[in-house]
A protein has these predicted regions:
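Glycan-recognition and catalytic cores of secretory/periplasmic carbohydrate-active enzymes
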Residues: 1-195
Length: 195
């Protein structure tokens, strides 16, 4: 079996277990795909059924799979994922991403993750580009710039990006992945806005 065939199988398996009632993907399951009580990836995470992080990390491989396998079912799943970000995960007022949700997409966290904001800004744009839907690209491009602009709230005078914020108090830790995603995210924002 080829690597591409394995990727296709994993895509079908993920899709088989998605939330058909409210859309999106649950955080975790037992080893036999049953509901699990503790869905957290770490002690720091909220024990909620859905997260931005899971959806972001499903969007990324779906985008890359779509590059080599332009399957209609995959295109529909990609479009649904982008729409979930636009309609549920993205805060319409602040342009930051919400982090945790119940199964009906009710917000369950007040933390702002600057690294995930800037990461999502470029991943959403890239996902729309690879999908090749001109209408979706027109919607996502300005939104991706707005998310990058919101992420600027985490930028410090030395050019680094802090980890996160809650109720206006910043966690001043510097994590490598946040700095790396900032390079890519701000590069895309510049390319798309020339600012």
């Amino acid at each position: 079996i080829t690597a591409l065939e394995r990727a296709k199988q994993l895509f079908e398996l993920i899709e088989e277990h998605k939330d058909r009632q409210y859309g999106g993907y649950f955080e975790a399951f037992t080893d036999d795909w049953k509901p699990i009580d503790d869905m957290r990836l770490s002690d720091k995470d909220a024990n909620e059924k859905k997260s931005m992080n899971t959806h972001l990390h499903i969007l990324e491989p779906y985008t890359n799979l779509l590059r080599v396998w332009p399957d209609e079912h995959l295109k529909v799943a990609q479009q649904e994922l982008i729409t979930i970000f636009l309609n549920h995960i993205l805060n319409a007022e602040t342009r930051h991403l919400e982090l945790f949700f119940d199964e009906r997409w009710n917000k369950k966290s007040s933390i702002i993750s600057f690294g995930h904001d800037i990461e999502a800004s470029w991943l959403l744009y890239e996902a729309a580009q690879v999908l090749g839907d001109s209408r979706m690209i027109k919607i996502v491009m300005p939104v991706s710039i707005e998310i990058a602009m919101a992420a600027l709230e985490g930028l410090e005078s030395d050019g680094s990006m802090v980890y996160e914020s809650e109720f206006g108090r910043k966690d001043m830790d510097r994590h490598w992945w946040v700095q790396a995603e900032s390079i890519v995210g701000f590069m895309y924002a510049y390319k798309n806005s020339e600012n």
